[in-house]
C-alpha cells in the first residue's frame, strides 16, 4: 500500500476544486488504476466540502470519505473564493510542512507518506504574510535540508504521438540578467548528477540520455555570441560523460526541441526557466507535471497557477493534477524497488 499526500494549495484558488475533481475521478473508475494507494488530502476539511458543493460534487465527496483521509489543517481566515488574503499565507505553508514532515523518516526510519503532490500556491500571498517565499522548489529544499534540487517538468506531446518530453533546469526562479553568473561548473556537475540519479532510481531508466542546451543564441556561435558554452557548459558535458552520464551538447536551444533530436532523449537540461519551459508548455500545458529532483522524497505538482477566476465555477480542469498524481505514484513505486 502506497500513501500519497496531496496539499490543496492556495485556498482562494482552484487547488481545492481540482483536488476534489481529480480524486473523485480516480475513485469512480470501474477498475481504479491506483487501487493500492491511500490518499491523504491535507487542507481545511470544511473548505474542501464547501468547494465540492460549489462545483456540484458535494454528495460524491461526502460518499468518498471512507476511501481517503483528510488531514485537517485550519484556515487562518474565512475564504472568499477568488480573493487572496494574506491571513491565509501561513496556512498554505502549514499544508506544505505537514506533507514534508510526513515524507521525511521519523526516528524509527519510517515515513508516513511515500510521495507528495502539491496544488498551486500564490507566492504573493505567502510573502504578504511576512514569509519570504520564492516557490515550492526552493521551500522544499530548505525544509528538507537538501543542498541542491532540480526542477524538471514533463508532459506528453500530442503533436508527436504523445511522446513524453522531460525538461530539467540548471537555474530556476532568477532574473534573466543573473543567469550567466549562476551557471557555474559546480552547478552543472551537481545538476547532471541529480538528473541522472533520479531518472534511474525514480523512473526506472537504466542509462538515461540527457541533451544539454547552450545559453546563448546558436550555442554561442563558436564564441562569437558568448563564451559560456566553450568555458562552462561543454566542459561540464565532458566531465559528465567521464562519470558515466550519457550527456550530449551543448545544442542551440532554438533547434533542439524537434522530434528528430528528441526521439532518443530521455531529458533535456536547459540553462534557464523560459528557455526550457516555453517549448514544453506549448505542447503540454494543462497536462504537464512539475517534478522536484534531488529531494529525499518524491514530489510532483501541476504546471499551472491558482486561476482565481475559475475557483468555485466548476470549469477548472484537473488534467495536470491527475498527471502529477500518476507520476508521483509511478516514481514512488520505482523508488521503493531501487
UniProtKB/Swiss-Prot annotation:
Main location: cytoplasm
Binding site for a divalent metal cation: 173, 218, 273
Pathway(s) of this molecule: Cofactor biosynthesis; pyridoxine 5'-phosphate biosynthesis; pyridoxine 5'-phosphate from D-erythrose 4-phosphate: step 4/5
GO molecular function annotation: 4-hydroxythreonine-4-phosphate dehydrogenase activity; cobalt ion binding; magnesium ion binding; NAD binding; zinc ion binding
SUPFAM superfamilies to which the protein is assigned, alphabetical: Isocitrate/Isopropylmalate dehydrogenase-like
InterPro entries found in the cross-reference section: PdxA, PdxA_fam
EC number: 1.1.1.262
Other remarks in the entry: The active site is located at the dimer interface.
The keyword Translocase appears for this protein: no
Quaternary structure annotation from Swiss-Prot or TrEMBL: Homodimer.
Residues annotated to bind substrate: 136-137, 281, 290, 299
Catalytic function, reaction form: 4-(phosphooxy)-L-threonine + NAD(+) = 3-amino-2-oxopropyl phosphate + CO2 + NADH
Keywords for the protein's UniProt record, in alphabetical order: Cobalt, Cytoplasm, Magnesium, Metal-binding, NAD, NADP, Oxidoreductase, Pyridoxine biosynthesis, Zinc
Purpose: Catalyzes the NAD(P)-dependent oxidation of 4-(phosphooxy)-L-threonine (HTP) into 2-amino-3-oxo-4-(phosphooxy)butyric acid which spontaneously decarboxylates to form 3-amino-2-oxopropyl phosphate (AHAP).
Protein name: 4-hydroxythreonine-4-phosphate dehydrogenase
Localization (cell): Cytoplasm
Amino acid at each position: 500500500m502506497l500513501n500519497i499526500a496531496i496539499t490543496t494549495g492556495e485556498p482562494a484558488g482552484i487547488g481545492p476544486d481540482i483536488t476534489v475533481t481529480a480524486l473523485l475521478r480516480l475513485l469512480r473508475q470501474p477498475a481504479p488504476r491506483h487501487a493500492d494507494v491511500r490518499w491523504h488530502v491535507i487542507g481545511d476539511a470544511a473548505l474542501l466540502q464547501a468547494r465540492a458543493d460549489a462545483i456540484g460534487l458535494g454528495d460524491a465527496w461526502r460518499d468518498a470519505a471512507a476511501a481517503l483521509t483528510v488531514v485537517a489543517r485550519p484556515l487562518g481566515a474565512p475564504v472568499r473564493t477568488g480573493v487572496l488574503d494574506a491571513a491565509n499565507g501561513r496556512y498554505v505553508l502549514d499544508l506544505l510542512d505537514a506533507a514534508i514532515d510526513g515524507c521525511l523518516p521519523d526516528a524509527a526510519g519510517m515515513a508516513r507518506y511515500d510521495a507528495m503532490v502539491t496544488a498551486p500556491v500564490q507566492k504573493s500571498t505567502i510573502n504578504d504574510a511576512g514569509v519570504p517565499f520564492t516557490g515550492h522548489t526552493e521551500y522544499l529544499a530548505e525544509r528538507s535540508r537538501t543542498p541542491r534540487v532540480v526542477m524538471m517538468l514533463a508532459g506528453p506531446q500530442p503533436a508527436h504521438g504523445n511522446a513524453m518530453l522531460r525538461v530539467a533546469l540548471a537555474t530556476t526562479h532568477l532574473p534573466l540578467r543573473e543567469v550567466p553568473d549562476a551557471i557555474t561548473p559546480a552547478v552543472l556537475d551537481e545538476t547532471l548528477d541529480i538528473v541522472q540519479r533520479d531518472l534511474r532510481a525514480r523512473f526506472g531508466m537504466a542509462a538515461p540520455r540527457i541533451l544539454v542546451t547552450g545559453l546563448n543564441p546558436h550555442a554561442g556561435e563558436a564564441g562569437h555570441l558568448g563564451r559560456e558554452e566553450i568555458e562552462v557548459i561543454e566542459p561540464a558535458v565532458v566531465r559528465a560523460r567521464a562519470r558515466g552520464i550519457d550527456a550530449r551538447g551543448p545544442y542551440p536551444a532554438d533547434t533542439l526541441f524537434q522530434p528528430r533530436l528528441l526521439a532518443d532523449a530521455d531529458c533535456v537540461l536547459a540553462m534557464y526557466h523560459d528557455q526550457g519551459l516555453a517549448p514544453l508548455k506549448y505542447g503540454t500545458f494543462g497536462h504537464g507535471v512539475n517534478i522536484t529532483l534531488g529531494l529525499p522524497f518524491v514530489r510532483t505538482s501541476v504546471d499551472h497557477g491558482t486561476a482565481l477566476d475559475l475557483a468555485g465555477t466548476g470549469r477548472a480542469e484537473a488534467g495536470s493534477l491527475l498527471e502529477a498524481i500518476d507520476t508521483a505514484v509511478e516514481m514512488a513505486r520505482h523508488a521503493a524497488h531501487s
